[in-house]
């Protein structure tokens, strides 16, 4: 994990990125950044203790509903992107599609529907680049 930390730290420094914790303080900071009109990137494939249960590669797993909830409450767009490691070892970040939350009413059904779109996108990208994705945790843990 040492080299991963170095990459993260270099990206933070180069692009003035702020990483927030998955706790109440981090959530409060995230909402403040959001209200201030800042762009927000969420790494929504992290292991969660809470969330909604969805199918991912044919198995049930917990998935964060935060991207869908934020988008529905604000009417903002969700851009689905993926970092691709190139042959020279550098990464290129590609954005493939967007979800226009303003097309949906703010309901729990639509939180699930948007979350399913996001997770289907993850599945498609992992299938396309399986050698570039690795979980460091038990992804299908439901408790």
Please identify what each model-predicted range represents.
Residues 1-7:
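Short, small-residue-biased leader/transition segments that mark boundaries at the very start
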Residues 24-143:
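Non-catalytic C-terminal accessory region of glycerolipid acyltransferases
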Residues 18-22:
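Short acidic-hydrophobic, aromatic-tinged amphipathic segments that line or gate anion-handling sites
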Residues 8, 12-16:
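Membrane-proximal helix-turn-helix segments that form the acceptor-binding/catalytic region
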């Amino acid at each position: 994990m040492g080299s991963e930390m170095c990459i993260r730290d270099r990206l933070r420094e180069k692009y003035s990125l702020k990483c927030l914790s998955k706790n109440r303080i981090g959530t409060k900071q995230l909402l403040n950044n959001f209200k201030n009109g800042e762009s927000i990137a969420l790494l929504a494939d992290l292991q969660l203790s809470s969330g909604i249960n969805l199918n991912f590669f044919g198995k049930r797993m917990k998935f964060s509903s935060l991207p869908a909830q934020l988008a529905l409450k604000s009417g903002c767009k969700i851009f689905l992107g993926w970092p691709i490691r190139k042959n020279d070892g550098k990464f290129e970040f590609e954005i493939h599609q967007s979800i226009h939350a303003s097309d949906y009413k703010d309901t729990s059904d639509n939180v699930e529907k948007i979350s399913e779109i996001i997770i289907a996108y993850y599945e498609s990208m992992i299938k396309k680049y399986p050698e570039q994705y690795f979980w460091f945790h038990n992804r299908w843990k439901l408790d």
